[in-house]
Amino acid sequence: MASLSQAVNSLFLKEFVGAIFLTMRHFFKQKATINYPFEKGPVSPRFRGEHALRRYPNGEERCIACKLCEAICPAQAITIEAGPRRNDGTRRTVRYDIDMVKCIYCGFCQEACPVDAIVEGPNFEFATETREELYFDKQRLLDNGDRWEREIARNLALDAPYR
């Protein structure tokens, strides 16, 4: 009896017809892929992309040179040199470098920062041709912060209830 059932299934190509119906069912559904670089998918507010240093609205950099981000970085990708204390008792960084080749994008630096100075922004398109271009200095980080400030502030506001 089993061989008869197997012969009928083979004769009528049951698996083949089933596969055709399955293909047709998925053929008319909405596409699961997008045409990247021309189309970009949604990015979560918690996305950890290219690093940026933020400024206060008056233009002063936020980083207070506490070096918590440097201490917590598991990859030791952050290097900070603090300048001398200013008259008001605060200090700022003279050097703030991130070696993106070493960075593992864990987000610990962002979590450790008491003033939200260092953040991981929304940009994920920063491919380079040389390794030297992946060594971000303070000026590049500040430029990233200026470029992405509106989106970074929006993402931090959306994430605030969970922090």
Curated annotation (Swiss-Prot):
Keyword Translocase recorded: yes
Binding site for [4Fe-4S] cluster 2: C73, C103, C106, C109
Single Gene Ontology BP annotation: aerobic respiration
Cofactors required: [4Fe-4S] cluster
GO terms under cellular component: plasma membrane
Protein name: NADH-quinone oxidoreductase subunit I
NCBIfam families: NuoI, PRK05888.1-4, PRK05888.1-5
The EC number(s) this enzyme carries: 7.1.1.-
Main subcellular location of this protein, as a coarse class: membrane
Subunit structure: NDH-1 is composed of 14 different subunits. Subunits NuoA, H, J, K, L, M, N constitute the membrane sector of the complex.
Signal sequence coordinates: none
